[in-house]
Amino acid sequence: MIAKDELKESLMDSLGCPDRTRSRELGGATYALLYLLMERLLSAGVSLIVDANFSHGISDTEIRQVAGDARITQILCHTSDAEVFRRYRERAESGDRHPGHHDTAPETIADLQISLAGNRHVPLELGAPLLIVDTTNGYQPGPAKIVAFAHDTLR
């Protein structure tokens, strides 16, 4: 499994991330690194799971290109905008997240608002099987059905 935030946090630790501008720069570098890793692993026949906040209209083409002939499936976790903001505030206030994300910076909050308003967190156009999971109160469908979906679509 490749988690985008783990890659970004490693870059933050190595290169420093004193402000939101640097965080955004490292975010772009992280996606470039993520796509490179995906391409290399998939071309070598390695199966993988990628955890990232891909954006409709931005990530679709890149993912299709790096996937090549690999079989892919998409699981989109979704909740209301209000719940996204509640979870975001809770996470930012917890102090558990890497400080390089600058979660409390006004620019970070504005970016989240723009992202939600732009409806970018909808299914990507990948021509692949899709499962939308409502995470408002647990997982609907539940974990067993999510695993079965992934298993069945990638056989």
Predicted regions and their residues:
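Conserved substrate/cofactor phosphate-moiety recognition/catalytic segment
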Residues: 1-44
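Conserved nucleotide-binding/hydrolysis micro-motifs of P-loop NTPases
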Residues: 6-8, 79-85, 137-139
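Conserved catalytic network of the ASCE P-loop NTPase/AAA+ motor domain
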Residues: 39-43, 66-70, 123-125
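Loop/turn-to-beta-strand initiation segments
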Residues: 44-48, 73
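Short, electropositive alpha-helical surface patch
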Residues: 55-70
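Conserved phosphate-donor/acceptor-positioning beta-strand/loop module used by diverse small-molecule
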Residues: 68-90, 133
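Small-molecule kinase domains that catalyze NTP-dependent phosphoryl transfer to phosphate-bearing small molecules
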Residues: 93-144
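C-terminal accessory "lid"/substrate-recognition subdomains
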Residues: 144-155
